[in-house]
Amino acid sequence: MIDTASELIVPARRAFLSGTSKVALSAAAVLLLAGKDSLAQSMGGPMAADVGILNVALGLEYEAINAYQLGAQSGLLQKPVLDVAVKFQGDHKGHRDALIATIEKMGGKPVEEKKLDDYAKVLKADTLKSQADVLDLAARLEIGATNAYLGVIPTLKDAQLAKVAARLAADETMHWTVLNSALSRSLPSDALPFGA
């Protein structure tokens, strides 16, 4: 079992999750993510910084996709849990596809996915010895993604734009909740446990 989530987080991800990167998505980038292309184009403005932020988010989605793949291939997941893991992997593939399309619409180049073996090393897949280990890893990645998406909401001035970021965070929160339930963990004892 891996002791801390910080062991899994690469420096760029750590900055993105902690908010120390001091960057936020523009309204145009969030509109593109929401499929509002014409409205986004009318806003104009430079989007290079947004492409960088979206590429960090894309990297997080690649990591989640590959973590679920490693879990599925491990032989450690029992049938009902394996089905849920495959479903969650599909959700992350949907997030990936939306991010790639948005980055390309912005004229950017999406960061490329690494090889599965690279993710296995970063995520220390060789330490996964049980279904609980796989679920624990996935839960830690899901809470990291939740907090990352929640981190962009305060920078948005428009309620509709904040809604898009909140929907992504809600997806990740749902995954985290299901995984924690499967691990028979209690609900958080404090109010407002997400986004801190």
Question: What residues fall within each predicted segment?
Answer:
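Intrinsically disordered, low-complexity polar regions and short flexible loop motifs
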Residues: 12
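All-alpha RGS (Regulator of G-protein Signaling) helical domain and cognate RGS-like helical scaffolds
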Residues: 2-9, 21-25, 31-196
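Eukaryotic intrinsically disordered, low-complexity regions enriched in proline/serine/threonine/glycine
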Residues: 15-17
